Amino acid sequence: MPKDRSKPLPVILFRTPYNNDEDRFIDLCIFFAQQGYIAVAQDLRGRYDSEGQFYPWVNEYNDGYDTIEWLGSQPWCDGSVGMIGRSYVGNVQWQAATISSSYLKAIVPRVIGDDLYRSPHYQGSASRLG
C-alpha cells in the first residue's frame, strides 16, 4: 500500500498461478504503490499460499469476481479495481470481466492466448458475457 493512506485509493489486482511471492509480482506491487495505487497479488485457488484445488480455468470466473467484489468494497478502496498481467494472469482478466462487477474499471491483458475460437472464455470467436 502507498505510504499516504489518508483517502481510499484504486486497486490494481494480479491473480496468478505463478506464485505471488516471486520478485516480479513484488516489484510490480511496489511500483504501483509508488504511483498511488493499492496493489494486490493473489495466488489462484490451490496454488502456493491459496487453499483448495487448482483446476485450470475452472474457478477463475467466480473466484475473480469474488476477489474484485471484496477488494472494491473495502474502506481503503475507492471503488475502482483494475487488473493487469500477461499469459495466464492476462487470460483470467477476461474471465473475471465476463461476470460484471461494478468495481472492475479496466483490464490490461497482455500476451494472452491467440486461439479465440477454442479459448476457455470465448465460444465460436464471440466473447462469453454471461
Feature roles, as predicted:
Residues 59-70, 74-76, 81-83, 93, ...:
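Active-site-proximal cofactor/substrate-binding loop regions of enzyme domains
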Residues 11-14, 38-42, 80-85, 105-111:
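Structural recognition of the beta-strand scaffold that forms the well-ordered cores
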Residues 23, 81, 117:
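Short acidic, gly/pro-rich beta-turn/loop elements at beta-sheet edges
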Residues 84, 88-130:
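A catalytic-pocket lid/entrance helix-loop region that shapes and gates access to the active site
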Residues 3-72, 120-122, 128:
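Cap/lid segment of the alpha/beta-hydrolase catalytic domain
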